[in-house]
From Swiss-Prot:
One Gene Ontology cellular component annotation held by this UniProt entry: cytoplasm
Name the record gives this protein: Centrosomal protein of 112 kDa
Keywords: Coiled coil, Cytoplasm, Cytoskeleton, Disease variant
Cited PANTHER family: CENTROSOMAL PROTEIN OF 112 KDA
Coiled coil: 277-954
Source species: Homo sapiens
Keyword Coiled coil: yes
Length: 955
């Protein structure tokens, strides 16, 4: 008996928990935040697990308390307490006692209707800051000075407050909570008692502590107690001396302020009492509602009891009718016996025939009743089998539809995978095209190098021609040397800029390598863009160097032409001067022969000095040209070394990137193949599991049908045995009747006196046999009905349990398949979005590179024009170039920041839009269908429970 009672308690607690879970579902779905929904789902799962709740009655009660508290908080719309965090592993902790306050809270709709302003003033005061509280207390104390004099009413209100607090502490205890009708008289008794109230601080603290209902460390206990003193010194201070007036007045004001604060506290407690009265009224309403529900249940129970009584009465009426029929049959039999007594002497054979007919009729009625019972039994079994077949057909149709949908989704996914592979092949083709373009650019670079060598050879020839120039080129050579130094500085600065650019590009490439590991397609596009940028920069540098060398060669040629023209002019001038001097000499020879000798000597000395000076200048020019050639050869070798090193670095970086790309492609293909294999394997396993389950169910149904058939055959055998026994008894009775008749004939012939005694004995024996037959037939009927009812109950329970198991398994499989489909859809959508984003980024970067290339072209053209026009403005042009470079850097930084912000926005949109609208709609449809199935099963379970209760009541 104790085990049965424990099982009933477990069933009641489980049913209560199921109701709580069903009531929670709409509120959980209405929660706005996804994290709260996930947390509620984790808590519900934790409560549904037997390992987390415990197996005993206390564990189930604790689980139900958690479920009730969660439902209450969901109805209220705010999660608090333990539900703000995820559930801890292990068993659930026991809820503390103060959590019962949540269950005692009134309905939010009633609370809103009761207070017109939504919240009382004391709640708003508790929420505001302490300074605002002080200001309000000052205002209220200044506006209500007239009410401070009425101290007895305040004392009485405090007495009411203390009494009310005691009543609340008693009413909220678990022992007195059921006696909801006895709350009001206790309150009246407390109001009638008026005891003197002390104004000590300890008394106030004790009352507040007694009013504390499980709330740990409330606000009014954290505040410091206010000292209370009487107002009697007010009158005595007015009669004191003037020396202490100010001091006493300040004390009086302080005491008045203390009294005002205490009066405000009293008002505050009165408002709390009013709210407590409202709360008690709400509690009383809840109790009335519960009592009404109990009365409704009682009325339902009484109606059911009345129905059962009516059925019992009907059955009793049927029994009475059967008894009457039996009495009528007995009367008819008695009449027949009397007739037989009368006609016994005339026709014993006719009497025997009548008895045989009656026995045949009784046996036929019994057989008809048995046949009807068998028909009912078979019909019930057929109905159960039809229901199970219909449900199985429905489940099979749903499973076929789901398999078709999954196959369709798999085909779509395969098509999308093929599209992605095609796009990858297109990207590979583009990469090959870029490699071809790179080879063409390298050829162009070699051609330009050969042209540069030719230009260098021409420059060497020009330098050789310069050796034959005269002393007049000293100034031009100095100018050329200054220009050459400036050009070398420019080249060094450009080389430093190119090296810094190369280092910055290497750092950017390293960062891009890190990003390539995360995203494969983005890394390919970035690599292509970086290669294009490097090639463009390399071309720009080549064109710039070409332009510089051509400009220098042109300048040298122009300077050589100018020098040749100047020398020719000077030679022509010298020739003219010599002619004039010769003419003068011929003229003066006649006049000054003596002076001629002196002039010849002076001329010879002058010639010697000129030759010496020319030789010195020529030697200095040769030394300077040799130094210039050595510097040029050094700069050439350094540039060649730097270009070779740069090319080697580029080749190493390209090889690394190509290896990384190949590895990433191989990993991507392996992951694709692995995922496809896993998907196919899971699909095959699911199909096999479904087929196995269907076969198992068919086998179970066949076994159940075989069991039912065997039971029916056993019942038939039993019925046949009973019928055979009855026929044997009837045959025995017939033989006994024949023997009795023969004995009667003999006795009539032999003994006429003993006829009456023998007749009486025969009638008595016949009645006893008939009564025995009737009792046995009634017992057999009752036993057959009981066995039939038990078998129907067992078959119903088995079918329901099997159907529940099948439904649970199919729901689990549906959830798994839906999860797999959702994951595949998310991966496909993410791949699509990444591909589109990569294409957009590539197009944008190409546009940016083109714009940069055009801007750089324009700037280089302008710089070259300015250099050709004005040599003096070189410094200004260089400063302008520096400013342009700074602007470019700022522009690049802004572009990089914009790209970073754009990538962040794209990833945020990715993360936000992971779940498409179609998937959400499908999930909502599945949730609604599951809800309808759950409601249908609940209704079915309630109907079966009612049938069981009615059957138990009949038994």
């Amino acid at each position: 008996m104790e085990v049965g009672s424990e099982e009933e308690k477990w069933e009641k607690l489980d049913a209560e928990f199921d109701h709580f879970v069903v009531d929670m579902k709409p509120f959980v779905l209405k929660l706005p935040h996804r994290t709260e929904r996930q947390r509620c789902a984790l808590w519900i799962r934790k409560l549904c697990e037997p390992s987390g709740t415990g197996a005993g009655i206390m564990g189930r009660k604790n689980r139900n308390l958690y479920a009730k508290l969660l439902l209450h908080m969901l109805k209220r719309g705010a999660l608090e307490g333990p539900f703000t965090h995820r559930p801890e592993p292990g068993t659930l902790k026991i809820l503390p006692s103060y959590m019962s306050i949540y269950f005692d809270e009134p309905n939010p709709a009633r609370a809103k209707g009761s207070s017109p302003e939504g919240l009382p003033a004391w709640v708003l005061g508790e929420l505001e800051t302490s300074e605002h509280k002080l200001n309000e207390s000052w205002k209220l104390s200044s506006g209500e000075d007239n009410t401070l004099v009425q101290s007895p009413t305040d004392v009485y209100s405090r007495e009411q407050y203390t009494g009310k607090l005691r009543v609340r502490s008693h009413s909220l205890s678990p022992t007195h909570r059921e006696d909801g009708q006895n709350i009001t008289p206790k309150i009246c008794e407390v109001y009638s008692k008026k005891s003197p109230v002390s104004l000590d601080d300890s008394d106030i603290e004790a009352r507040l502590n007694s009013w504390n209902l499980g709330i740990e460390n409330p606000r009014y206990l954290r505040q410091k107690p206010i000292p209370v003193s009487l107002m009697t010194p007010k009158f005595s201070l007015r009669k004191s001396s003037s020396f202490h007036d100010d001091h006493f007045l300040s004390r009086i004001r302080e005491k008045e302020l203390d009294m005002k604060t205490k009066m405000m506290e009293a008002k505050f407690h009165e408002e709390k009492l009013k709210l407590q009265q409202k709360h008690d009224a709400d509690v009383q309403k809840i109790l009335e509602r519960k009592n009404n529900e109990i009365e409704e249940l009682k009325t339902l129970y009484r109606s059911k009891q009345h129905e059962t009584e009516e059925t019992i009465r009907k059955l009793e009426k049927k029994v009475q009718t059967l008894i009457r029929d039996c009495q009528v049959i007995r009367e008819t039999k008695e009449d027949q016996i009397a007739e037989l007594k009368k006609i016994c002497e005339q026709s014993t054979e006719s009497l025997n025939n009548d008895w045989e007919k009656k026995l045949h009729n009784a046996v036929a009625e019994m057989e008809q009743e048995k046949f009807d019972l068998q028909k009912q039994h078979t019909e019930n079994i057929q109905e159960l089998l039809e229901d199970t077949n219909v449900r199985l057909n429905k489940m099979e149709s749903e499973y076929m539809a789901q398999t078709q949908s999954t196959n369709h989704m798999i085909k779509e996914l395969e098509a999308r995978v093929q599209q992605l592979t095609g796009e990858a092949e297109n990207s590979n083709l583009q990469r090959q095209k870029l490699i071809q373009e790179k080879a063409e650019l390298e050829r162009c670079y070699q051609i330009t190098c050969s042209e540069l060598q030719e230009v260098k050879a021409r420059r060497n020839t020009l330098h050789k021609e310069k050796d034959h120039l005269v002393n007049d080129y000293e100034q031009n050579m100095k100018l050329l040397q200054t220009k050459y130094d400036a050009d070398i500085n420019l080249l060094k600065q450009e080389h430093a800029l190119s090296a810094s650019k190369a280092s910055s590009m290497i750092e950017e490439l390293e960062q891009n390598v890190c990003q390539l590991k995360q995203q494969l397609q983005e890394s390919e596009l970035q690599r292509k863009q970086q290669l294009r940028d490097q090639e463009n920069k390399f071309q720009m540098e080549k064109s710039h160097l070409k332009h510089i060398y051509e400009k220098k060669a042109h300048d040298l040629q122009s300077e050589l032409d100018k020098g040749k023209e100047d020398t020719q002019k000077k030679i022509h001038k010298f020739e003219e001067a010599l002619k004039e001097k010769e003419e003068q000499l011929t003229r003066v020879t006649e006049v000054q022969r003596l002076q001629a000798q002196q002039a010849d000597a002076a001329l010879e000395e002058f010639k010697r000095q000129v030759e010496l000076n020319s030789e010195k200048v020529y030697a200095e020019m040769k030394e300077q040209m040799e130094k210039v050639e050595a510097d040029l050869t050094r700069s050439k070798s350094l540039r060649e070394k730097q270009s070779k090193e740069f090319l080697w670095q580029l080749e190493d970086i390209r090889q690394r990137y190509e290896q990384q790309i190949v590895e990433l492609k191989l990993e991507h293909e392996q992951e694709k193949t692995h995922l496809l294999q896993q998907h196919n394997a899971e699909k095959d396993s699911l199909v096999r599991d479904h087929e196995r389950e269907i076969e198992n169910l068919e086998k179970q149904l066949r076994a159940a049908n075989m069991e039912h058939e065997n039971q029916i055959q056993e019942f038939k055998k039993r019925d046949a045995q009973v019928i055979a026994d009855m026929e044997a008894q009837v045959h025995k009775l017939r033989e006994e009747l024949i023997n009795v008749n023969s004995q009667r004939k003999q006795q009539l012939v032999e003994l006429g006196l003993l006829r009456e005694e023998e007749k009486q004995r025969a009638t008595r024996e016949h009645e006893i046999v008939v009564n025995k037959l009737k009792a046995e037939s009634e017992k057999m009927k009752i036993e057959l009905k009981k066995t039939h009812a038990a078998e129907t109950e067992m078959t119903l329970e088995k079918a329901n349990s099997k159907l529940k198991q099948i439904e649970k398994e199919y729901t689990q499989k549906l959830a798994k398949s839906s999860q797999i489909i959702a994951e595949l859809q998310t991966t496909i959508s993410s791949l699509k979005e990444e591909n589109s984003q990569q294409q957009l980024a590539a197009e944008r970067r190409l546009q940016d590179v083109r714009q940069k290339f055009e801007d750089e072209k324009k700037q280089l053209i302008r710089d070259n024009d300015q250099a050709i026009k004005v040599l003096q403005d070189e410094l200004e042009n260089r400063s302008n170039q520096v400013r342009c470079a700074e602007k470019k850097l700022q522009h690049k930084e802004l572009e990089s920041q914009e790209q970073i912000t754009y990538i962040r926005q794209e990833y945020e949109t990715k993360l936000k839009g992971l779940m498409p609208a179609s998937l959400r709609q499908e999930l909502e449809d599945t949730i609604s269908s599951l809800k309808s199935q759950v409601n249908f099963l609940q209704k079915r379970a309630s109907i079966l429970q009612e049938e069981l209760t009615t059957y138990q009541g009949r038994r």
